[in-house]
């Protein structure tokens, strides 16, 4: 689970302006951090299917936001996926 300080660090790293918490970059980065955290959780708790449903929902939401960002601004999309290490 992400702590409040972890969330603030992610927001500070990806925000476009001070106080920005809703830009696609910030939302995608927060979802990616939560997804990575849950993936580590599933290595230990393989039978936790209830949380797995939430993980799939987060992955789908991130995919939608990435598609939106790609459609709106391709350069921001490309820089974000390289920073996050998505799409090798």
From Swiss-Prot:
Q: Which GO terms describe its molecular function?
A: rRNA binding; structural constituent of ribosome
What InterPro entries does this protein's entry cite?
Ribosomal_uS15 (IPR000589), Ribosomal_uS15_bac-type (IPR005290), uS15_NS1_RNA-bd_sf (IPR009068)
Q: Which UniProt keywords apply?
A: Ribonucleoprotein, Ribosomal protein, RNA-binding, rRNA-binding
Q: Provide the residue span(s) of the region labelled Disordered.
A: 1-23
> One GO cellular component from the entry?
cytosolic small ribosomal subunit
**Polar residues composition bias: which ranges?**
1-12
Calcium as UniProt keyword: no
Subunit composition and interactions: Part of the 30S ribosomal subunit. Forms a bridge to the 50S subunit in the 70S ribosome, contacting the 23S rRNA.
Q: What is this protein called?
A: Small ribosomal subunit protein uS15
Q: Which organism is it from?
A: Psychrobacter sp. (strain PRwf-1)
């Amino acid at each position: 689970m992400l702590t409040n300080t972890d969330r603030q660090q992610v927001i500070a790293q990806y925000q476009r302006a001070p106080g920005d918490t809703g830009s696609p970059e910030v939302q995608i980065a927060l979802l990616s951090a939560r997804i990575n955290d849950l993936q580590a959780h599933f290595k230990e708790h393989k039978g936790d299917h209830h949380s797995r449903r939430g993980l799939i929902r987060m992955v789908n939401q991130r995919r939608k936001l990435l598609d939106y960002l790609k459609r709106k601004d391709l350069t921001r999309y490309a820089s974000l996926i390289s920073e996050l290490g998505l799409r090798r």
